[in-house]
């Protein structure tokens, strides 16, 4: 059957074909972008599907119900996975008795912070082993290990919310289970309870984004209180007072000394006056421990530690 079209119909069809061809041509301009987006999506999902070598959600490993806080490093060596062949730590040996105060000192980049990261199992050692109460920490359940350890770093992280909200985050499991008594006890140990109770809203006071409503010393003492919420047996201090002015440092240092009581404490210190009372001081140099002893012993050796003390004394003048 032969069909006939009017000129109007012909023009409509012709116009549709022309404009359709133009739009189809425009689509091809986006082909490179579509290809790039597809490749990026593939890479992103491959990354999301990766399982960490150290999985905090894993149920594997021995659960350490009770912890004395005896820490031992046995011939520990470490190099970062991204820098193979460049050892950061070599042959590290430390025996830190329960309840003792130990300090790590040395120049920047000598391996002090890496030592603390290994203790928390952010990484696993490349050689040797780290023991907690005689257990290789790699054999312990990770959540169980971190339950007994708390870290106070140089730059405390506070979240937009109340003081109470930020303190409850220190609980390893359910923050809602933290009692008011526990909150007050942690704040008292961190030497900040009087300050909190003097505020109109008390523990419900808003701290602002990143704690902008608080001073540096107040933020640091809140971080100490948060670390104590879980009542850890091991306290790690990574230059916890180095970013503070001298007045705030004295207040925070008093809080740290109180928090360290009855706990195994490993402190990284830039200002050596804050760790002169330590039971043992380990002086790091280029990834190895070059000296170990108390303040007086190391001064008499007239080595790296004595040199650091002299330099800081000169800086004050």
Task: Give residue ranges: language-model regions.
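ABC-type nucleotide-binding domain
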Residues: 64-317
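Amphipathic, soluble alpha-helical interaction motifs
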Residues: 23, 30, 47-50, 278, ...
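Cytosolic ends of transmembrane helices, especially the final helix of ABC transmembrane type-1 domains
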Residues: 13, 17-47
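An intracellular "coupling" helix at the cytosolic face of ABC transporter transmembrane type-1 domains
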Residues: 1-4, 22, 26-36, 53, ...
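Conserved E/DxxT/N motif and adjacent residues on the DHp alpha2 helix
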Residues: 46, 53, 168
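Pre-NBD coupling/linker segments of ABC/ABC-like ATPases
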Residues: 53-66
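Membrane-water interface of transmembrane alpha-helices in multipass transporters/channels
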Residues: 3-15
């Amino acid at each position: 059957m032969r069909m006939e079209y009017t000129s109007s119909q012909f023009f409509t069809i012709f116009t549709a074909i022309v404009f359709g061809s133009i739009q189809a041509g425009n689509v091809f301009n986006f082909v490179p972008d579509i290809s790039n987006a597809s490749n990026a999506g593939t890479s992103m999902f491959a990354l999301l599907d990766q399982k960490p070598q150290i999985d905090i959600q894993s149920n594997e490993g021995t659960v350490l119900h009770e912890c004395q806080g005896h820490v031992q490093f046995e011939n520990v060596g470490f190099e970062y996975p991204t820098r193979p062949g460049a050892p950061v730590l070599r042959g590290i040996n430390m025996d830190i008795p329960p309840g003792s105060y130990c300090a790590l000192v040395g120049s920047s980049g000598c391996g002090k912070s890496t030592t603390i990261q290994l203790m928390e199992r952010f990484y696993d050692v490349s050689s040797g082993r780290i023991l907690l109460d005689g257990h290789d920490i790699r054999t312990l359940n990770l959540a169980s290990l971190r339950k007994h350890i708390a870290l106070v770093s140089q730059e405390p992280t506070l979240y937009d919310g109340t003081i109470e909200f930020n303190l409850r985050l220190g609980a390893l499991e359910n923050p809602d289970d933290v009692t008011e008594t526990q909150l007050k006890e942690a704040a008292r140990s961190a030497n900040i309870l009087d300050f909190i109770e003097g505020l109109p809203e008390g523990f419900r006071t808003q701290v602002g984004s990143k704690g902008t409503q608080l001073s540096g010393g107040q933020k640091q003492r809140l971080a100490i209180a948060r670390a104590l919420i879980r009542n850890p047996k091991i306290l790690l201090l990574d230059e916890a007072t180095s970013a503070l002015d001298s007045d705030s440092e004295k207040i925070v240092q008093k809080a740290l000394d109180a928090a360290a009581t009855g706990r195994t404490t490993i402190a990284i210190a830039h200002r050596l006056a804050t760790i002169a009372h330590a039971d043992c001081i380990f002086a790091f140099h280029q990834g190895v421990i070059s000296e170990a002893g108390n303040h007086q012993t190391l001064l008499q050796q007239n080595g790296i530690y004595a040199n650091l003390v002299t330099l800081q004394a000169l800086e004050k003048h």
